[in-house]
């Protein structure tokens, strides 16, 4: 929260994205990244603190600083955290949510579960962005059509293909 306040006060950001999507074992084995939403109280405290800090610092600076949250489906197929994390983030004032439609254990393997993006889109009142398996413009259009999501977050699909955003 202190870092978010500093960024807002120094006019170095127009939004803050809390990324709980990292599946890398050196991060998740310590409870960070994609594993953090499993720690519901800590997840709640972090999101609440950053939203509050951005609201307060933004008010002093005379501008709105939205906080967005990125999550994964969960740790694995038996430990789904997306529903609770998404509803919690919305309740705490997150401006939007991005779902990487894989579990932590999947890392980047297999197909992304776009149906989970559609499910969260139906569940939430805030904008939902989809992430996973978007490597070209046709993939982005397919995700928008299949899920009804409000936008696309491109990750690995832009590596070596920066023109994807132009397409």
Q: What spans do the regions from the language model cover?
A:
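Flavin-dependent oxidoreductase catalytic cores
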Residues: 1-167
